[in-house]
Amino acid sequence: MSNQQNDAKRAAARRVIQDFVFDGMTLGLGSGTTSHFFVRELGQHVAKGLQLTCTTTSRATSEVARDVGIELSDPNEMNEIDLTIDGPDEIDRRFNMIKGGGACLLWEKIIAHASKRMICICDETKIVNCLGQFPLPVEIVPFAWKQTERRVERVLAEQGLHHVPIIRRMGGGHPVITDSGNFILDCHCGAIITAPEPLEIELNRIPGVVENGLFTREATGMVVGYFDGSSYVQLR
């Protein structure tokens, strides 16, 4: 990751704190590199006295939050969350997203739907005209996973996405295991997902699919950082 991209992520993190985070809020802290920039920036404000109740969408984010002095709460002990800040792997101009490059998509979607608002935070490289260049992750249970993979391939074809390479995500020679103990199938669709909402719904109807990385309803706004250190806000 270049220094310019880091500057863009940091600019977005600072802008979202400036415009959307207030004393006394309950916050969901998202996953991924841009979200971690946000969490580190947030830690500086907490150290100066900002009072927040926070939960996270992954074990990795929990580690970052604790490292910067942010106390975390069990989401089961929280009421509706005021705001979740999370980052996409891709986002289009209609606020449709692909998330899950860090294999945290299930927890991310749970916390997003437990929140009054979700603001997407990203750098300029994540903005796309059409989703799909980034592989679409589908979280599946390990049992009979090959059968589930075949059904995923069939649904993709029914939605106009034919001959899509589907690869079970690996790491260190072993299948990647999510925080919930599941596998990830990465669907290399190409930038041709023109109807993400019905695809999201149909994938989730497959027995064995836990969740997929299309987020079509969650984001209420985006904060985008640019390489020159500037940022902008767009609301839905």
From Swiss-Prot:
This is Ribose-5-phosphate isomerase A 2. The active site is at E108 (proton acceptor). It is an enzyme of class 5 (isomerase). One of its GO terms (biological process) is D-ribose metabolic process. Catalyzes the reversible conversion of ribose-5-phosphate to ribulose 5-phosphate. It holds the Pfam family Rib_5-P_isom_A. It comes from Yersinia pestis. Gene3D superfamilies: 3.30.70.260, 3.40.50.1360. Substrate binds at S31, G32, T33, T34, D86, G87, P88, D89, K99, G100, G101, G102, K126. Pathway: Carbohydrate degradation; pentose phosphate pathway; D-ribose 5-phosphate from D-ribulose 5-phosphate (non-oxidative stage): step 1/1. Keywords: Isomerase. Belongs to the ribose 5-phosphate isomerase family. One of its GO terms (cellular component) is cytosol. It catalyses: aldehydo-D-ribose 5-phosphate = D-ribulose 5-phosphate. One of its GO terms (molecular function) is ribose-5-phosphate isomerase activity. Homodimer. Its EC number is 5.3.1.6. PANTHER family: RIBOSE-5-PHOSPHATE ISOMERASE.
